[in-house]
Swiss-Prot record:
Organism: Rickettsia rickettsii (strain Sheila Smith)
Subunit architecture: Homotetramer, a dimer of dimers. One homotetramer interacts with 1 SecA dimer.
Disulfide pattern: none
PANTHER family in the cross-refs: PROTEIN-EXPORT PROTEIN SECB, PTHR36918
Listed name of the protein: Protein-export protein SecB
GO cellular component, one term: cytoplasm
Entry keywords, A to Z: Chaperone, Cytoplasm, Protein transport, Translocation, Transport
Amino acid sequence: MSTINTDTNETMPHISVNAQYIKDLSLENPSAPSSLAALDQRPQIDLSLDINITNLSEESFYEVELNIEAIARNEKYKLFQVELKYAGVFNLINIDSEQHPVLLSVHCPAMIFPFARKIIASCTQDAGFQPLMIDPIDFGALYHKKMSEHQN
């Protein structure tokens, strides 16, 4: 049997997820029921994603919010539009503040994204469509792209 030394764990750098929650969720199915009969071809999906980071206190507590919008269209109809604001509260424990931006922009969103993805898939399925399975997102690449845009 192994034991865990909690004294060491308390001083180790780590990220604690204190909460995860839906802040806002909207699904529009504007052309139903006609749009549900016109599902013989794969719709065009326009997807946008944004990340908002809010410092919640002088300590290292942050809210990381994913804003995801997906619009599905075919030749005739706007099939659906789903908007989700999904957030998590993170505590960055014993982590140098210089590392906070990359952790909050890359690692924290990656931790909560699978939950947001599942919510969107469930909503679109409940609206009568195939579940929208958003491809995995490379938050590291998004962060580096954003940093290079700020430098230019």
